[in-house]
């Protein structure tokens, strides 16, 4: 692996670290928003080779494969619930999206600054601290899968150059 490739892979590790830093700084709304951006990015990278843009099903598949809560949590993530929550937050900064209005079986997410989720039949109060930890764990699991699965790695590597990178600039 070239140094350039290593830097691009490291950019994904840095996303998880930035997510944790944002949360640690007390920026709950920013951390929540960036959490969904992280999932979007990973689901884009994992697309089948023949696809160039992601769809709802790609996001849900990535969530169902990689995003796992602690076994003791009263709510375990479901791709459709997380996708609807993502749409609600990113498109309306809300808890309700069109998917919730069309399908009452899709659970609404509310958020609190603690760690333990609270689950009710139609509403889940997501502990942001746990959600952040779970997303970072999902990123790590995805990166491990990329390392171990040559076919997955071959799909991901060409897309890494499209992921936003930041570079330090030193003033003269």
Annotate each predicted stretch with a short phrase.
Residues 12, 31, 79-82:
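Hydrophobic packing residues in well-ordered alpha-helices of helical domains and bundles
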Residues 65-171:
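Long, charged low-complexity segments
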């Amino acid at each position: 692996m070239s140094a350039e490739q290593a830097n691009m892979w490291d950019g994904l590790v840095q996303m998880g670290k930035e997510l944790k830093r944002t949360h640690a700084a007390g920026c709950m709304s920013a951390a929540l928003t960036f959490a969904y951006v992280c999932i979007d990015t990973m689901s884009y990278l994992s697309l089948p080779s023949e696809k160039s843009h992601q769809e709802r099903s790609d996001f849900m598949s990535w969530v169902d494969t990689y995003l796992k809560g602690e076994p003791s949590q009263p709510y375990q993530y479901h791709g459709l619930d997380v996708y609807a929550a993502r749409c609600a937050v990113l498109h309306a900064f809300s808890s309700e999206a069109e998917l919730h209005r069309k399908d009452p079986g899709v659970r609404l997410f509310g958020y609190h600054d603690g760690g333990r989720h609270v689950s009710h039949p139609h509403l889940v109060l997501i502990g942001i601290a746990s959600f952040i930890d779970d997303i970072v764990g999902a990123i790590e699991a995805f990166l491990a899968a990329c390392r171990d699965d040559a076919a997955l790695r071959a799909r991901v590597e060409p897309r890494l150059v499209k992921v936003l990178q930041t570079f330090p600039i030193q003033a003269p």
